[in-house]
Amino acid sequence: MCYFISKKKGLGGFFLKKNENIRWQQHFLYPLLFHNDFYVIDPNLLFNSSPSFEKIEKLPNSFRFLNVKRSIKLLHQQNYLVYNTRSSCFNFIGKTFFFCFDIFVSTWWKHFFGFKVTFKEINQQVNFQSVFSLFLFLEEVFMFSLSFSNIRIPSSIHSELLIRRFKFSIQDVSFLHFLSFILFSKQFKFVNNSIIFPRGNVIFCFFLGNILLSIFEDFFTLRWKSCFHEKSLSYGLFSEQKHFQQKWNFLTRKPKKKDTIRLLKDFFFHYIRYGEKLILLGTTILVKKCEFFFLNFWQTYLFVLSEPSSFFLKQISSQNIFFLAYYLEYPTNSFLLRLNILDYFLSTDFVGRELNSKLSAVFVIQFLSKEGLCDIMGNPKSKLAWLSFTDNSILDKYDHFCRNVDSFYSEAINKRFLDRVKDILFLSCIKTLACKHKSTIRIVRKELGFELRKIFVRKQVEFKNKKLLYFCFHKQFRKLLFKIDLVTERLWFLDILEVNNFTKFWVKQQNALDFFFIFDQNIWFMLDQFL
């Protein structure tokens, strides 16, 4: 089933028409925006002041519909964009694409709510009293819901990761090439593996993210239904099996009317998702389960792969969650959220919650103590496992720790505690070298004073000059995304010790591949000589 855009006489606008006969367009998404009929809109829309398009940047004076038609013809030509990326028409095509994409989304939403799709009526303000008029099922759900939750998921997704995820769901190769071409164009800026979108292109980023999220929502609903219809389960302990049988016997007995109502009520939940906003409605247990799902989804599929064995949902309410390379703190901060689905709808204000990614000092000390760099109280000690290494390798390891501390923990913890962590690493390095050479700390400090100062002091100035960001959100992009002063300094940061496991695993794989390649070459060389 495919949707395409066509013009209807008498309305002066466009509508979505359903056609089941045209099957060759089933896997093609991007040609929707390159039909000539789509751009035959009212010229007064661009040049008159419209309250629904106040936030859109004004296009240059050279914007004309004849130029749009010419650019469409150039797009249909083979390999035009590949050889003419430096031309002035390339920037014009990009601006036209995102502007028409914004109109396309607004038109579809207005058609969905049952209005006449005429661009002349966009100037008229459509007033709604609440969100209930937009989503009718909320009138019944809000009254009987025990709790609701609001989650704002960041949308800083790397473009290459987006394209790889789309390969599993979209079979259209031309759409993937076109998507990669747009994301790697000059309109986007990349700062150390993080993409920064301009102001007018945030809607396009939300559109791609919502497509990915809808795919995993379908998978989540199937798993949600199967867990209630599952009869045979695998158990790790006999007590778990006995406890499950008791609960199952309690549910299968003939319940009263009140029990049946409560039992059926816990199975359903409702939510709204638009852009980066997500509103969950239901009982308290279901809301918590959905929050866990979306947190796990964000960390698993959009940043790094999580390890299920080290992830426990019961730890969320009490302490931080430790992923393979991330620390996530679940305690939330309340803030005032303004829900504005479209520009011509009234905004609704209500209090929501945000994820707090600030890390406390206790968990860092505990993690350093597990690695053997200090004790539970924070007193540094020597790393006995590194005594067999050379002095240069030991200094390189501590150098790597200090680099990651400056880059990842500069805004996550207080500056005073950051200096404390560096002092722990500094004294641990000296004690390790002193234990290896069987000397005192004072002698090691005199002999290696210059190299230690080069590692633990000069790296701060070096990182301040380069302004390395890595996986942090850019400051301007954070303000644009959240639009709240409280979260502009929040960031997601990597762990400084577990990152090496990724590189070690990758090096082992590369060494194994090189070994088999050399072994294969030697076999063919021996066969040639033998023959």
From Swiss-Prot:
- GO CC terms: chloroplast
Q: Which InterPro entries does the entry mention?
A: Domain_X (IPR024937), Maturase_MatK (IPR002866), Maturase_MatK_N (IPR024942)
- Protein keywords: Chloroplast, mRNA processing, Plastid, RNA-binding, tRNA processing
What does the record list as GO biological process? mRNA processing; RNA splicing; tRNA processing
Which terms does the record give in the GO molecular function aspect? RNA binding
Q: What is its main location?
A: plastid
Localization recorded for this chain is: Plastid, Chloroplast
Keyword set includes Plastid: yes
Q: What does this protein do?
A: Usually encoded in the trnK tRNA gene intron. Probably assists in splicing its own and other chloroplast group II introns.
Q: Which family does it belong to?
A: Belongs to the intron maturase 2 family. MatK subfamily.
Q: What protein name does the entry list?
A: Maturase K
Gene name of this polypeptide: matK
